[in-house]
């Protein structure tokens, strides 16, 4: 690898490696951006061109019974979170009942996002949309193998469909945006291979009037900070789902961003703005 000041050539070298290992590619890619920005004593956000100062993130409630779901939402609400992502994808009628009960309890005090975990059919998806209210978006209702079926959804439903597992690469982004499989792309740096790949997908979305959601798995503040700074550099970023470091028992670093009342704001420190603990 060349001197860290040669960011583009170093990134290009990594882009051609780890073809089937996007997590490792993302780790190298993020490290290169962090080191490069630190060499210039600027934040990653400044280098990428942050245009959104801060955004709220959703926080996730897993597949649970209705009482447990409401209890957990209450806890998050008390902590300041107003955007709640509910994991569904079991039985459609029970999924509808859960959301109906949540709406009865919380009304407009929270915004609901759904992750159907590839668990529904096209008919289930349409039924859910017809029977529920107050849902901001639905992640990946259909299995990856049946992604083509999303084209059968009414345009009104496609407006709130977020492609997740189906969206891995730049080529996927071109296909799904030009043919309107859904009007939201959920980008995860560990899924696509890092900041560079994430930006390529984002630019395709921007050119095709597709909104962006930025997600994660259970991850360190390191990669969450990378995703946050990348997200806030695109005007079509509308949704954050970057709660992956919240429940970690222990992290390798601290810093990166402030999280207050569910709103994420990057720290203006060199690189990712993180420090070893």
Write out the residue ranges for each language-model feature:
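Catalytic core of soluble alpha/beta enzymes
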Residues: 86, 92-225, 250-252, 259
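A generic structural signal for well-ordered alpha-helical segments
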Residues: 36-37, 154, 205, 231
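Metal- or metallocofactor-binding catalytic centers and their adjacent structured scaffolds
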Residues: 1-40
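Flexible C-terminal active-site loop/helix
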Residues: 217-277
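Active-site mouth loops of central-metabolism enzymes
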Residues: 54-68, 117, 121, 162
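N-terminal small/glycine-rich loop or linker at the start of catalytic domains
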Residues: 38-63, 98
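Catalytic domains of carbohydrate-active enzymes, especially glycoside hydrolases
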Residues: 76-87
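Active-site beta->alpha loop and helix N-cap motifs at the rims of alpha/beta catalytic domains
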Residues: 42, 59-71, 75, 92, ...
